[in-house]
């Protein structure tokens, strides 16, 4: 129970980490992912994420924002990435890059990444913004 509460708190905290302000009517969607890694699998997890980041960059998309645990709760890595839809061209470029790299995709990715995780959670949020900017949506 304590672990689940910590993950929920961390997801909220992640939103604070995303600095900058967007116009309230045009907030981007962000995927916030929190990972607790299986013992001894930290390097392998980061290598897999680095491969997917390289595919993003090759397709003209930004790499994920990675935060590494320094103190406090029981998580290891926090990742923030865009949840906005990619164009068909971007999807094709990412898929081609991943295939060329030999990276697992689809069901194989689902199984591969879970080799490294003890626990994870993800959520979609809008932002970054401020309370004042967000409240303007109510006008």
Segment roles from a protein language model:
Residues 18-24:
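Sec/Tat signal peptide C-region and signal peptidase I cleavage site
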Residues 24-29, 57-58:
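Short, low-complexity N-terminal intrinsically disordered segments enriched in polar/charged residues
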Residues 2-13:
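Bacterial N-terminal signal peptides that target proteins for export
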Residues 28-36, 78-80:
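Active-site-flanking beta-strand signature of metal-NTP-handling nucleotidyl enzymes
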Residues 75-78, 134:
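Short, solvent-exposed polar/charged micro-motifs at secondary-structure junctions
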Residues 67-74:
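A short beta-turn/loop motif at secondary-structure boundaries
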Residues 36-47:
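Short, surface-exposed ligand-recognition loops at beta-strand->loop->(often short) alpha-helix junctions
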Residues 51-66, 82-130, 135-139:
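An amphipathic, aromatic/His-enriched active-site/gating alpha helix that lines ligand/cofactor pockets
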């Amino acid at each position: 129970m304590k672990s689940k509460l910590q993950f929920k708190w961390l997801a909220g905290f992640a939103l604070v980490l995303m600095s900058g302000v967007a116009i309230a009517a045009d907030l981007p969607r962000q995927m916030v992912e929190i990972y607790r890694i299986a013992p001894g699998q930290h390097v392998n997890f980061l290598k897999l994420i680095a491969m997917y980041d390289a595919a993003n960059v090759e397709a003209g998309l930004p790499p994920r924002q990675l935060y590494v645990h320094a103190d406090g709760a029981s998580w290891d890595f926090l990742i923030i990435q865009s949840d906005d839809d990619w164009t068909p061209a971007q999807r094709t470029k990412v898929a081609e890059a991943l295939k060329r790299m030999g990276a697992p995709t689809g069901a194989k990715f689902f199984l591969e990444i879970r080799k490294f995780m003890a626990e994870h959670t993800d959520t979609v949020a809008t932002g970054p913004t401020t309370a004042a900017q967000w409240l303007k949506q109510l006008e």
